[in-house]
Amino acid sequence: MKTILIFLVVISLMYSGEAQEVAHTYCGRHLADTLADLCFGVEKRSGAQYAPYFWTRQYLGSRGKRSVVDECCFRPCTLDVLLSYCD
């Protein structure tokens, strides 16, 4: 009986961890509202912290060329991806 209880606890913990990483598609107003809710209170970087345009384009890689719509509307994304657009 004790092993069954431990097994059920382990399974429930594994399931709850996976549930947090479920990807959804966010488009249009739903995308804007979700970003607003997630980013509310997140401190934005000042302009002085940004690199010059020529340096930024050179070192950004593929992530810098994608938009939030590319990543979360055209295909599913997690809340962690959306949070990366808050700063």
UniProtKB/Swiss-Prot annotation:
GO molecular function, one term: growth factor activity
Compartment list: Secreted
Signal peptide: 1-19
Propeptide: 46-64
Record keyword Cytoplasm present: no
Transmembrane feature ranges: none
Keywords (A to Z) from UniProt: Cleavage on pair of basic residues, Disulfide bond, Hormone, Secreted, Signal
InterPro entries: Bombyxin (IPR017097), Bombyxin_B (IPR027285), Insulin-like (IPR016179), Insulin-like_sf (IPR036438), Insulin_CS (IPR022353), Insulin_family (IPR022352)
Disulfide links within the chain: 27-73, 39-86, 72-77
PANTHER family according to UniProt: INSULIN-LIKE PEPTIDE 1-RELATED (PTHR13647:SF4), INSULIN-LIKE PEPTIDE 2-RELATED (PTHR13647)
Misc. remarks from the entry: Silk worm has two kinds of PTTH: 4K-PTTH and 22K-PTTH; there are many forms of 4K-PTTH.
Protein's recorded name: Bombyxin B-10
Annotated organism of origin: Bombyx mori
Gene it is expressed from: BBXB10
